Design a protein with these regions (language model features):
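Ribonuclease/tRNase effector modules and their secretory precursors
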Residues: 1-147
Length: 147
């Protein structure tokens, strides 16, 4: 196994919007921003944030750059979140290994992978708590992030 199976955690100071509540304009924004991050990765490589570095160092997870790039190239955006001033997306891979798919949280500002975990392929989140999401959150990314 390349990654730890994910557990749902609530993060202080974080607001989230599930992709099912995105407007058409918001869908365009987050997918364009993802393309920008992908281009950054292709030019300078994948960078990982301190949180993920700590998880790797502490043995909480393993990390694969190859699997992370596959996720960037072939995934669905599951949610958008704002944590402090950072704007992030959660990507769920279409590529499965051992009946698991990789999920990564990527900063749209820095391009770094914030965290990474695995989900079962058949996990359709029937137990997902809708109270963790704000369907009224307005996604309004700066133009330089969506070009």
């Amino acid at each position: 196994m390349d990654f730890q199976i994910g557990t749902v955690k609530k993060t202080q100071g974080q607001v989230k919007k599930h992709a099912s509540h995105f407007t058409h304009k918001e869908v365009e924004q987050v997918y364009n921003a993802r393309e920008r991050v992908k281009d950054l990765w292709l030019k300078r490589g994948i960078k990982i944030g301190f949180h993920l570095q700590d998880k790797i160092r502490n043995g909480e997870t393993k990390f694969s750059y190859e699997m992370t790039m596959k996720t960037m190239l072939n995934s669905t955006i599951v949610e958008y979140n704002e944590t402090g001033a950072d704007k992030r997306i959660l990507l769920r891979s279409h590529y499965s290994k051992n009946k698991e798919v990789q999920c990564i949280v990527v900063s749209l500002i820095s391009g770094k992978v914030i965290t990474s975990y695995l989900n079962k392929v058949d996990d359709v989140h029937k137990t997902l708590d809708p109270r963790r999401y704000d369907k009224n959150l307005k996604i309004n990314l700066p133009k330089h992030l969506t070009k």
